[in-house]
Amino acid sequence: QGGSDVRANITTAVADDEVPGFTYRLVGHKWFCSAPMCDAFLVLAKSRGGLSCFLMPRVLSDGRHNAMHLARLKDKLGNRSNASAEIELHGALAFLVGEEGRGVRTIVDMVNCTRLDCVTGSAALMRQALVQAVHHARHRHAFGSRLVEQPLMANVLADLALESEAATSLMVRLAGAADQAEGDEQEERLRRIGTAVGKYWVCKRTPPMVAEALECLGGNGYVEESVMPRLLREAPLNSIWEGSGNVNALDVLRAAAKEPGVVDALFGELGQAAGGDRRLDDHVGALRKELDHGTDLEYRARRLVEAMALALQGSLLVRFAPTAVADAFCASRLGGDGGHAFGTLPSGVDCSAVLERAAPGL
């Protein structure tokens, strides 16, 4: 078993006599277990009180291996340096974490941390792909000049650089919210909604961005001697881990409906950039109207979360990035003056300034 419908879990937990109310024996099957070489695992299983969270050690205190059998390692598209296994539990010893029947609520803090990890990893993949593309274009000569000096390639690279900086800016802001969440209600609310927004959008944008960066290297990017194939295989993973795109988009709606203040925290964050760019202001106003229009929210969830992500990225770039970067982002992502593929930035963008910001002197 595995996947997003955690309440469909049929792995069972039976109270053990060793320490009543604390130790349990787990019986069941886990379709996906990431990093099976770890010393301990957080596991959801159904006990008498309902779905509960348990800490399951790999090795017991007396040195014996716990009753956890690795049925096989998964043959994955990418992420091969990190093992994923299918495991069977035959009465494995585990310790109750939190209250019985409140497993999802108990484990959600871990999920929020790993969702931020997914955003961080995807932003890093974007950055590495961008650096490879820019370095190649600055040193590769074709048709009488360096690739980076050719207007269309400069457009492509600058567009990739905008995507990378926007992803990194959002990731850093979410990390800051996570650091400050304890003791700061507004930061906690922003972390709650923003992490799911960032997980959806940054991870979703990584595969096409990495694919475009690979194309900048031509055939050299498609051979295994290059790092690009590995980046491309890795790129889709973070959209799947810790909830696919639909799961995170629906989680944003759930938070907005059930957790008072998260939407206000979002717009409070966006309000700090008010007046900095007309296109951003218009986008934020349209977003508020979309949220107020309460019909078909589930159907429109991806559209809404995309708009939230772009608003957050735009606001951060308007506040903290050079004018050339913020203006290019707002024009191409918020102003309706960009295309669907990378390399469709509108006229007037200072591509040289964007690229020098992204990779000075590379």
Positions of predicted regions on the chain:
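Flexible, glycine/threonine-enriched loop-and-boundary segments that flank and lead into catalytic domains
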Residues: 1-40, 188-204, 208-224
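A short core secondary-structure module
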Residues: 22-67
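Alpha-helix capping/hinge segments and adjacent helical runs
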Residues: 25, 192-267, 327, 335-362
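A glycine-rich, basic-preceded beta-loop-alpha segment at the flavin cofactor/substrate interface
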Residues: 62-67, 71, 83-114, 131-148, ...
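Conserved catalytic-core motifs characterized by acidic clusters
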Residues: 71-73, 96-110, 135-151, 174-190, ...
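C-terminal helix-coil-helix/basic helical segment that borders enzyme active sites and/or dimer interfaces
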Residues: 165-199, 214-215, 288-301, 305
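C-terminal amphipathic alpha-helical interaction region
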Residues: 259, 265, 269-362
